[in-house]
Amino acid sequence: MARTPNTDRRQRGGDDQRNRSPRSDERDEEFLDKLVHINRVAKVVKGGRRFAFAALVVVGDGKGRVGFGTGKAREVPEAIRKATDQAKRTMIKVPLREGRTLHHDTNGHFGAGWVTLRSAPAGTGIISGGPMRAVFETMGVQDVVGKCTGTTNPYNMIKATFDALVNSQAPRQVAARRGKKVGDIVARRDGAAAAGATE
């Protein structure tokens, strides 16, 4: 008779765990993740070299939130898992114009790498490659032109891209900072874009 309550608690605990797992899976499915780069690293110890794998992962929700992370482990899957977890903890929110492109052109740099991001009209697509494309795809950007100079290191390219994205602001933020109306900011932006298209 004394074992019955314990058995019931174990059963209820098992049911709770089974009920929790689908919700955690749903949370994971909300994010898109892309493996940008993976390489083997070595640590020199007294007994020789100890090898491990380092992974660089980009995670986004397809609606303007994006983050990147790095992970290191003896096995590739574990390194990717660590990088993915770190990326989810360090996500930033980037305002998108019409849910498809950036509000304005922006620049960023890290180390020797310089990145230029330009907003683009509908139908342009993602004109960028390598690590930068992974950032745009997971973030939900559909039209953008990106260029990176000075480095081919994927880590520096990702950090320079995020430095540029952090500087991206919505018209409402710019208007609040300058003490102007949102309509004036949008009209000036659209006028500059039209002038650039005719040149």
Swiss-Prot record:
Keyword Plastid: no
Function in brief: With S4 and S12 plays an important role in translational accuracy.
Domain of life of the native organism: Bacteria
Free-text note regarding domains: The N-terminal domain interacts with the head of the 30S subunit; the C-terminal domain interacts with the body and contacts protein S4. The interaction surface between S4 and S5 is involved in control of translational fidelity.
SUPFAM superfamilies reported in the protein's UniProt record: dsRNA-binding domain-like, Ribosomal protein S5 domain 2-like
UniProt keyword annotation of rRNA-binding present: yes
Molecular function terms from GO: rRNA binding; structural constituent of ribosome
Pfam families noted in UniProt: Ribosomal_S5 (PF00333), Ribosomal_S5_C (PF03719)
A GO CC annotation given for this chain: small ribosomal subunit
HAMAP family: Ribosomal_uS5_B
Family designation: Belongs to the universal ribosomal protein uS5 family.
Subunit structure, as described in the record: Part of the 30S ribosomal subunit. Contacts proteins S4 and S8.
Family matches, as PROSITE patterns: RIBOSOMAL_S5, S5_DSRBD
Organism: Rhodospirillum rubrum (strain ATCC 11170 / ATH 1.1.1 / DSM 467 / LMG 4362 / NCIMB 8255 / S1)
Segments of this protein annotated with the region Disordered: 1-28
Keywords attached to this entry: Ribonucleoprotein, Ribosomal protein, RNA-binding, rRNA-binding
Protein name: Small ribosomal subunit protein uS5
S5 DRBM domain boundaries: 31-94
Gene Ontology terms describing biological process: translation
Gene: rpsE
